[in-house]
Design a protein with these regions (language model features):
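Transmembrane beta-barrel domains of Gram-negative outer membranes and organellar outer membranes
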Residues: 26-219
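Cleavable N-terminal export/targeting peptides
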Residues: 1-32
Length: 219
């Protein structure tokens, strides 16, 4: 099962500051668009990655997630922005209403909060997620909004295509938010050992190149 989107947030204050996007998640690494999947009850994962995100910000992130009961996944993420020398903490819950299958789309809702120091910036977001199987791959759709303190909410929308490439799983995605240039992103992920995933992505926003590389361990 893919990792939860606090990369998402586009789970991340790193992303929020540039486009008010979620990645919060963490989406299923290395995607920024979230998927409707969650970990099985009693299972979890730890995702870690380095990225150059919107605005040229560079950051390290560690993001654990766990499903205490069927259909509910809770997660946290700590990001250190080495460009701004700031630290962001994010917490989110993801409730799956229907599980994705080959015959039916899956749906989930995500609620999250974030705090950045030393700027003392607070943010919150909401994301509706749908995943549908469309042979030979999967389509993921996101629609939500994010808000920082004393500012109006900003809507965002995202779409991603994910497909098995044989040697790895690959994706291409598009994310847009109010008052920000859209992001186009693509990348692979591959299991290099039992329960251990290596992943990466490269993308563009407003003429800038974005990239990330990370690992995800299931437990």
């Amino acid at each position: 099962m893919t990792a939860m989107s606090l990369q998402s947030l586009a789970r991340k204050l790193l992303v929020l500051s540039a486009a008010a996007l979620p990645l919060v998640a963490h989406a299923g690494r290395p995607m920024m668009v979230d998927d409707a999947g969650v970990n099985d009850a009693g299972a979890g994962h730890l995702a870690t990655w380095f990225e150059r995100g919107p605005g040229g910000h560079r950051a390290w992130t560690a993001a654990p997630a766990y499903a205490p009961i069927k259909g509910l996944e809770v997660g946290a993420a700590v990001s250190r922005d080495t460009t701004e020398r700031s630290t962001a903490l994010r917490l989110q819950g993801k409730l799956q209403s229907t599980r994705p299958t080959e015959d039916a789309c899956g749906h989930a809702a995500v609620l999250g909060i974030a705090h950045e120091r030393p700027k003392a910036v607070n943010a919150r977001w909401f994301n509706l997620v749908m995943t549908c199987t469309v042979a030979p791959g999967n389509v993921h759709l996101n629609l939500g909004a994010t808000q920082t303190a004393r500012k109006s909410a900003k809507a965002f929308i995202g779409a991603a295509w994910e497909q098995d490439l044989g040697w790895a799983s690959g994706h291409v995605e598009w994310i847009a938010a109010q008052s920000a240039q859209p992001i186009v992103n693509l990348g692979p992920r591959r299991e290099i050992a039992k329960g251990l995933q290596l992943d990466g992505s490269v993308g563009r926003q407003a003429g800038r190149t974005l990239f990330s590389v990370g690992l995800k361990q299931q437990f």
